[in-house]
Amino acid sequence: DKLPLTSVFTVRGCTINCAECGGSHFANGNVVCRKKPAFRSPEKLAEDISVIQSYLDTPIFIVGDLRQHSAGYAQRFLKECRDRGVKNHVVIELFNGAGMEYFNDVDRTFENGWSIEFSPDSHDEKVRSVLGKGYTNQAIEQTIPTAFECGCSRFDLFYMNGLPYQDRESAMDSARVAKKLWASVKQEDKLFIYNAPFAPFVDPGSRIFENPSEWGYTLRARTLEEHRRLLDNPSWKHVLSYETKWMSRDDVAEISYNKIPMLDAESAMKLGNRKL
């Protein structure tokens, strides 16, 4: 955790249209006129990792799901990394569920360890589907233990508060579901579940930013200057650039704080009351 995290990028642009994302397919087309994503070749991506490895013994985050282009892209990349003898710890990103075959391939490639970043954003399938993430809770629940069984050393899972069609109860349930997810893995498995506000700003260029009323949002900032002024506020709640039909800024803040003891209690049980 004390080492710097370096990054390599699989792609410029994206094939996915997550409503809240300023790097979505919609945002890239609308803001930078990119009609389709431009993928770095698997061989060049592996070369990027080799260059970092030659200078630093530090974790390397591969930005973008390796399978976004195709399964063949991921296989070519992993083979190239094996041929180059990648030794650094590697962090992969998931945009949907994954299975044993993929994780086994990752595990035999990165012998010195690998971990996962996965952002479902909500446990609520309705909320997630509206955002543009159509995979099921079952896919998430199967992915996590499978990853650990195949050698994953750490799994970071991210939920947010303040999403379209997400009311207070739905937001709280994302914390409650942590108990089920932690119960699905062994005590020694490092599953970290984060639950935080969609903050501080709605991504400029995202579908929500460009059409806020369509998504049930009221924005408090549109221009750069308006966003700068929000940063002068005394608390993070007042920095938020939005409210939704389902949750006010007060709701987002209250829910965020109410989840803390719930998540603390569950994580303490998961870790056998060891210090977090």
Residue ranges: model-predicted function:
Residues 25-29, 54-59, 152-158, 174, ...:
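Short acidic (Asp/Glu) and glycine-rich catalytic loops that position anionic groups and cofactors
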Residues 226-276:
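Radical SAM enzyme core and accessory elements
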Residues 2-41:
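Canonical Radical SAM [4Fe-4S] cluster-binding loop centered on the CxxxCxxC motif
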